[in-house]
Amino acid sequence: QLFADYFLGCGVAAGRFVFGDHIDAKPNFSVACNAVDAGRFHPDAAARAATRAAWGITDTDRLAGFVGRLNHQKNPLFLMEVFAAMAAQDPHWKLLLVGTGEMEPEMRAAAARRGLTDRVIFAGVQSDVPAFMNAFDLFLLPSNFEGSPVTLVEAQGCGVPCLASTNVPDDGSVTDLVHFLPLAAPLTDWAAKAEAIAAHGDHDDHWAALSAAGYELKTAARRMEQLYDKLGGHA
């Protein structure tokens, strides 16, 4: 803060973490959203059907999903505990994990201990993330900490209900698809909440709200251009 004239953060919480608790109250701070491409992350019934078929997900299966690194930040072992509670309530649930990381061996061992090996899919690193997002019936993000997770916006863009921990900042929660629970809540509460919100999943288009909040890529680019013009004395 000694040398900068203007400050940007991907969210208010991220800005406070980097620049200080009261940075968002200053006139020289703005949020530059982690925007995503609406042309890629949108409801796509064909991609949903194809991806589910490719990974052996039947019409009667219910698919919970996660996209990200399997590391301490993302709290994957807790995610597995949540899924185990969900699976105990409904045998049709499966879990698909997109991504890898240092905790993958522990995740595989946890799935085996709970007898869930045939219901947990480790998909590894994938390039077509929108197709997987569309395949999900529920997106899980029980992180220990986050800045402003782009995956939460991507899931909303695809119309997927989301259940995140209260450790995840609510900056990107701009639709009624996102729900939060504390990590201290009982696993049965997590399972019940997952069941409730997944039951009302619609895979509808929510881009009007996301764009208005600044999370559509072209909208975000225009806002950034306007900010540069203003700071450069051209506006």
Map each language-model feature to its residues.
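A short, active-site helix/loop in glycosyltransferases that binds the activated sugar's phosphate group
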Residues: 2-42
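A short helix/loop element that forms part of the nucleotide-sugar donor recognition site in Leloir-type
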Residues: 42-57
